[in-house]
């Protein structure tokens, strides 16, 4: 049921919150996701494991993409792999993506470390007092540029996907 879904998501994803009073998922969000074709309707008000997996994808995507872009990305998957009696389903997709992401953690850590080191070697001609703040700013700019470029690429790729039927 919806209350169980919001509680479960809050418990599982609370470590990703920036502020303690941030909400991971609300009933209104779930209703909006269903209304915007991101989430298939529940079966007699009951949500399945696959609903939770789709909600996890939505949770991560919504920080980068518009609701429309998320629909373009997820609708073909939910149409083809949601609640199917097949070995390959939403859970298979989720597991494969998680495995791929976990395999990249070291690479991402190295990339972040390199961005930090680059920033650490910037503003060497500035007084010590100001240098630390400017280096932190440079580090944030470096990370932001990385996110910006990747977001642009993601949006371009989404724009090239077929638009889902209503």
Model-inferred region functions:
Residues 1-81:
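Basic helix-turn-helix/winged-helix DNA-binding cores
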